[in-house]
Amino acid sequence: MPVLHNLVSNEELKARMLAETEPRTTVSFYKYFTIEDPRAFRDALYVALTRLKVFGRVYVAAEGINAQVSVPASLYEEMKATLYGFHPALDKLRMNIALDDDGKSFWVLRLKVRERIVADGITDESFDASDVGAYLKAAEVNAMLDDPEAVFVDMRNHYEYEVGHFDNALEIPADTFRDQLPMAVDMLEQDKDKKIVMYCTGGIRCEKASAWMRHNGYENVYHIEGGIIEYARRAREQGLPVRFKGKNFVFDERMGERISDDVIAHCHQCGEPCDNHVNCLNDGCHLLFIQCPACAVKFNHCCSPLCMEELALTPEEQRARRAGRENGNKIFNKSRGLLSTTMHIPSPKE
């Protein structure tokens, strides 16, 4: 059977999505369970989700499924029922509905088979991914935040942590989840007897991280059920204080969900308070960075004068300049800061 996939251009698909009048619901979900034939599972799921006009990104692996999708609001319940009945392990699957949603998060459906649904780099065959830490619900999270014996650990990337996090949460300063796992084990060694509370966007990374910590001898390990998304939703529903500050970064066109009114990040170009992530407009760069409205005008939506200069060239001149250059300009590395003098990133105090 040929691989089922979309054949329409991204430009046309995006135009179709923007022209839609029916509201869409953005939702994420994941589940660790054994899939015997990931390719067959992927193809059957592609057919089922296409019928329901679902857009988004879905990863399938032998260890489970990880998805961020949008669906017409009128078809949400049908999609949920379809997933519940698709495999016994997906019955009553937790669905994390977006908190701050304009329905324009995705415009194409992509399902990919991967080695892992989260790239963890774990090769230890004795590792048991099912031996996870204890789940924490919203009220329990708030109680832990007031517990001096609890250490909150953010298992997201730097650019996610930068725009939003729990007060005093430990950042693991690595560019990838696979690098964070061994770093977390080392960084928390002095807190091994404390309560280790791990969290991430929707739960998938912190669940595996909690199992990794237990595998490495940590006993009092917890993780927030459903991640930041589920925590904020349940806290609001139950009338509890939402203790997460700032934005929750998301991996779609929205680039973030507003959780609180706090703006804790700063423009990477002028240092003014700002938490608006953008991609550099230069096709040879597309760096993800934080840019305020004033700097967007000043730098023509680019990350640096170098990219402004390149953007002003003809398409042929741009291609010639980019020839042989590896991985774009790499002006600002996500966790290691300034890599080029072409972009000044001031501290908040400057």
Curated annotation (Swiss-Prot):
Catalysed conversion reaction: uridine(34) in tRNA + AH2 + O2 = 5-hydroxyuridine(34) in tRNA + A + H2O
Name of the molecule in the record: tRNA uridine(34) hydroxylase
Rhodanese domain: residues covered: 146-240
NCBIfam families documented for this protein: PRK00142.1-1 (NF001133)
HAMAP family xrefs: TrhO
Catalytic residues in the record: C200 (cysteine persulfide intermediate)
Pfam family, one: Rhodanese
Gene3D superfamilies: 3.30.70.100, Rhodanese-like domain
Family per similarity comment: Belongs to the TrhO family.
Record InterPro entries: Rhodanese-like_dom, Rhodanese-like_dom_sf, Rhodanese_C, TrhO, TRHO_N
Presence of the UniProt keyword NADP in the record: no
GO biological process: tRNA modification
E.C. code: 1.14.-.-
EC top class, as a word: oxidoreductase
Keyword line: Oxidoreductase, tRNA processing
GO molecular function: oxidoreductase activity, acting on paired donors, with incorporation or reduction of molecular oxygen
Summary of the function given for this chain in its UniProt record: Catalyzes oxygen-dependent 5-hydroxyuridine (ho5U) modification at position 34 in tRNAs.
